[in-house]
Each structure stands twice: as C-alpha cells, then as structure tokens.
Amino acid sequence: MTKAAISPQDLSWPFWPIVPLYPYGQRRTIRQEVVKDTLWTFEQLQGIFYVVVPIRMTVIKLASGGLFVYAPVAPTPECIRLMRELESEHGEVKYIILPTISGIEHKVFVGPFARYFPKAIVYVAPNQWSFPLNLPLSWLGLPAKRTEILPADSATTPLGKDFSYEILPAIDLNVGYFSEVAFFHHYSQTLLLTDGIISIPEDPPAILELDPYPLLFHAKNTAKDLVEDTPENRRRGWQRICLFALYFQPPVLAVPNWIKVFRDAFTAKEKSKKAYFGLFPFQWGDDWQKTFLNLRREGRLIVAPILQTLILNRTTDEVIQWVDRISQWPIKQVIPCHFASPIQADSQEFQQAFSFLSKDYYLPKDDLECLESIDSFLVRWRLTPPPDKKL
C-alpha cells in the first residue's frame, strides 16, 4: 500500500487509552517477508515521550497450511488487511500466541486481534497475572472458549509438528511476575523471543523512518535547536532513543535545573504541543556516542540492561537452565519483538548473551549506575527480592 493510499481510518487503534503509548490511536504497520512464502514480520512502533522502538509480530506458515501468529500487534485496518492477504495465499490463522505474562504492551493486543480470526486457538504463557486485580483471562478480552494455557511439553500440542518451545519459569518480583516463552521454528531454524534478547541497529528501523519526528526531537542538543531532517540527524536521534529506552538515564545524560528548562522553553523556536511546548529537559555529554557503541556491542545479541539488573538475576539458576535448553536448538536466526530483526545468530551467540548471569556484566558498570541505583532502592524497601549471587 502506497503512502498516498493510507487514510487515518486505516491506522486506527481505538483501544489505545487502555495502554496510552505513542503513537496512540494512529499506528502504521510494515510487513516484511523474512523467509519466502514462510515467515513474515509485522512492525509497528510505540513508546513514551518520543522514546519509541519497534514492536513486532511474527507470522509463520504451518507445514500443513494455515498461519501461526506470535505476539500480535495492534489490529488496525491496515494490519488486518495485510493479514488477509497472507490468509488468501497460505490459509487462515490457526494459532495465536501470547508469549509473555508481564508485557502489557503485548497483552493488550491479543484479545482484539483474536476477534478477527474466530477459528484460531489462542495459546497463552502460563501464570498470567494482571494488576491491580488478578482477573480471569476472559475479563482481559481473551476469547473464553478458545484460549488455552501452553503446556510444558510442546510435543503434546498441535504446534509440536512445526515448533519446539521453552517456558521460562515465572520469576517472582513481589510486585508481579516475569516469564516468556521462546519458540523455535524447525523449518526456518528461527528463534522467536519477546523481550529476552535484542540486537541494536546502528540506524533507525524502517518503521521509525515513516515519521521521523521522534528521531529529530531527540537529535536536538538544546531546546532552541531546529534540527534539519538528514540521515545523520535521524541516526543521532535513534541512538539517543536507544540509550533512553535501555538505561533510563545513562551517565552521559544530565537533567538541567528546571528553572533553566522553563527559561529555555520560552526561547525555543518550536513551542507546539507536539514539541512539548518547547520543554527539553536533556543535556547530553560529549561522549554519549561512545556509550551507545558500548551498549550496541557491534550489533551482537544482548540482554536488555533492565532485564540484566532488575529481573533475570533474581532466579539465576532457572534462567541459565532455560537458556541452556534453548541453546540445544540449531538456531540460525533470531526474531525478537523489539529493536533489530531478523538477526543472524547461532545457539552459541544466544548463550553468550546471558553470560552476565555467571560473570561480570559485559556492559560498562558506570553505564548501569542508574539501574543499579533503582535495584538498590527496590531491595532496600523490600519491593523486590535481592539478586542471586553469580554462579
């Protein structure tokens, strides 16, 4: 579909107030064929304060015909139209997977998406929970008569002909639980993950290029800047977005005095609501790009710093066992739900990404300062359990 053919109705996501993330009720979708006539990704974007990253759904053709959907995205008219095109060639959607128990940005789409495919079985990761009340799945919008919990053994499900999967035992964080299900597609030797692994591209993903405003907003150095739309500025904005998204507040970022922030807003050249009325409470250090390069690690597989410091290190032994089981599969490529995709990587590279569980962090300790401070606060007030000792 050409850009001229897109209308606001095509992009409509009416349930955005449930999880009010940018771009709210208007979401573009890009479909990419990864393996010819076999595997496709559907990308949208979402975030807060223009800290936006891709969110990805994977669709795979089953050997017996029909389609498998991993981690649905917002079922906008554009997205459903692209799905119908695949159905017309490869058969109807048979299975829809909710592979996470904690990612509300993934959960919110599953029920509305499933309504467009009334014959599909919806499989969900075990130990689902909701906050502030732990509600039945049907109350969360999932179809009651065709939603099933994934059993521990993939061979006991109809999925076993095409896939193996491994469920990460639920990690009790006191304030909630974390778990996800990794799927391995035998034919394409593709590993599917939700949040457990990422690879950071140097340049902005295509879905962010469709509307570069968030990239250019974060490319600014001061509130007074009017940033020209160039590839270099888009790249700078993307790399800073990555630092925000994965570190919250990297050490190369200072927050100026709020009196100065408001004073600068009065002199900003763009004061629209879109530009937050000129407010720009960020001051980047000269070596911010070095911090990005350290984080990116030349595009290798990594575990997001937030997961390294606040979540996966709570049940180290169980996480390592989960990683070891996944590493037995003959992986050739990895498709996570965020950042780069597809990633050409094997089982050994996947396993190495989790080396922080038994060794020192492979990211610079100074860059983890904010996250470790959050960790110390949560543990001190007994809001989360303390991290395990490294094995």
Language-model segments: residues:
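Short His-Asn-centered micro-motif
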Residues: Y70-V73, I97-S102, H106, V124-P126, ...
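Short active-site-adjacent helix-start/loop capping segments
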Residues: Y50-V51, P77-I80, I104-K107, F131-L133, ...
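Catalytic core of the metallo-beta-lactamase
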Residues: T2-R81, L135-A223, L246-A254, W258, ...
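Small-side-chain structural scaffolding
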Residues: M57-T58, A120, V124, Q128, ...
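A general structural motif
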Residues: S64-G66, H90-V93, K119, Y187-Q189, ...
